[in-house]
Amino acid sequence: DKPKYQAEVISTLEVKKDGDSFAISDDSLKAFLSQALYDCMEPYNAVCEILDIQNFLQSYLDASFKGEVTQFAKHTSRTEEEALAWYETETFDPPSELGEAYVQRYKDALKNIMKQCQYSTGIPKKDAGGFNYTMDVTVVPNNSLIDAMNEFQQGTYYSIDEVSAGLVATLEKYAAAPTYGEETTVNVPVNFNSLISAGEDNADLTNLSLLILPT
């Protein structure tokens, strides 16, 4: 095969005499390199973009389920403190009837269940139309929460304190020994619509979260 060439591009470099030598201004050199290396770097840029999308979804899941917010903060221009506050908001609010003495144990048990969720993100595939990708996500459903609630509801309780103690003890049991379903792989779209609708009923990322941790 013969080499293929694109249209000729003429660049103008600003060269100034500096004593006995000549120097090219930084701005002029940057402009030249951006023209000369654009096509050379484009394949690398495309790969970096794909890996960045994969890292974003992985960091979103890690922040949502495990409170690991460092990478998620970088992707969302939040501070780590702001990302951690996002993780804490509402997720661990106990039932209003729960006795005050059990609130912290409830939160700790729920966090421990969520931290043991199992998932991994695959390499994204670029689809037509700008920022538009699909990605395989492999999930081992963490059935601990739904199993804990089913077990708790089978008990008999005679006071609010017994209800609180029973709920927390059951959650702690499954936090110590999680239960899992069968491994499955789902194809998840990652685009502006899926990101904007995250958290809404039947949204793609909401459905993914419910697959990871059924409720």
What are these regions, as identified by a protein language model?
Residues 1-2, 97-167:
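Surface-exposed, charged secondary-structure patches
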Residues 122-123, 174-178:
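Beta-strand-rich interaction surfaces with strong enrichment in secreted/lumenal proteins
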Residues 165-175:
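A short, charged
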Residues 1, 36-112, 119:
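Core segments of small alpha/beta cavity-forming domains
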Residues 72, 127-134, 187-196:
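Solvent-exposed, well-ordered amphipathic alpha-helical segments
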Residues 33-35, 40-43, 71, 75, ...:
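Generic local-structure boundary detector
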Residues 2-48, 156-162, 176-215:
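Short beta-strand edge/turn micro-motifs at domain boundaries
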